[in-house]
Amino acid sequence: MRRAQERTRRNVPGRYWPRLHDLQGHDQIRWVVDLLRARPWTTSAWISLTIPGEPADGLPCLTALSFRIRGYRLIMTAMFRSQNVHRAYLAYIPLREVQLRVSDELGLPAGPLRVFVDVPHVHVADAERVASVLAAVPEPNAA
C-alpha cells in the first residue's frame, strides 16, 4: 500500500500538472482553495484545462475540474472530452490525489470523485484484450 501511495504522489505531476498549477501563470488549484476558503457560501469552483485558441491537436483529454462542497465533503468532478477506456482508468488515481490535496487544504473530508467522459473509445490494437476482459465478466442475471 505504501509503495502505491508513493508512486501515486510521484505520478501526480504528470502531463496535467502545468495546466493545474501554471496555466498561463495561474495556479488554478491554489485559486480553487483560496476561493472556497474565502467564500465558503460559494460551495463550488470550476477550472478549465483548455486554452482558448490552442491548436486542436494540443487539446488535453481532461478539459475541466469541478470542486463542490456538499454535506461538508469535497466532491470533485472531472470532465474528459475523450478517453481510451481500456488504458486510461489509472489516470483517476492522480485525480483523486488532487481532490485529497484540495480537501486537506480546506480541512474537509473528500467525498466522491465523479468522472464524465464525452467520447469513450477503445483502440483497435486493444480490441482483443478488451474482449477477453468483457468475456470474463459474468452476465448480470445469469443463474
Question: Where do the PLM segments sit?
Answer:
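Terminal, non-catalytic protein-protein interaction segments that mediate quaternary/complex assembly
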Residues: 1-143
